[in-house]
């Protein structure tokens, strides 16, 4: 079934969706994000159960309380939501193929070039690190980040690469010695799961689901540039000595799509029983 994108306040769009759902007659409608959750909450008159997924950290979470159950990709995204909820994390992409071993060329960071991603902290933390860093992404902070790179005389070892599609990331993973997550806040960094599945070490701030994967002493305090710099300076240039093999195996088994489907189905079953 398909329906055109509709606005939160579109009377005609909501009516089309209402008619479509009446024809389908679902037991459960599962929405993702605040927009679709708002729309379904406004048209549902108790004809079906409503599950809402939260993927990022939101200031206003009240709309999610109009559903019957909330799924969050990490603890912090559902904190403060006062209805039944459960953490079901993101997963690594099932189409990923394992990488061949070989000499690695650079450290890698991936994400939108926005303040929340902490790339300014990452750049400031790179002064004493010898390894090359590639940041993949685009966004409104690009010019500020380029200026920061130049101000610190780091252009010879930090590059920003734009225009990389998701299916092209594997080319960069292949030559990466480590993936770095520098976010100030985050719902659940999927790139970290992909890297760990591909047996690429990860260094991260304590955001999203990362505390389910790493002990606290292997995570930098979020929104703390000094803590991030300390973690990176201790590990990046000698990353080959950091053994994360047990974490690679844990992520492959516990963050696969099959396991997450089972967890979501358990939520559905509990709603239908009740």
Regions found by a protein language model. Give the residues of each.
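Donor nucleotide-sugar binding/catalytic pocket of nucleotide-sugar-dependent glycosyltransferases
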Residues: 66-98
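Nucleotide-activated donor-binding/catalytic signature segment of Leloir-type glycosyltransferases, i.e.
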Residues: 146-164
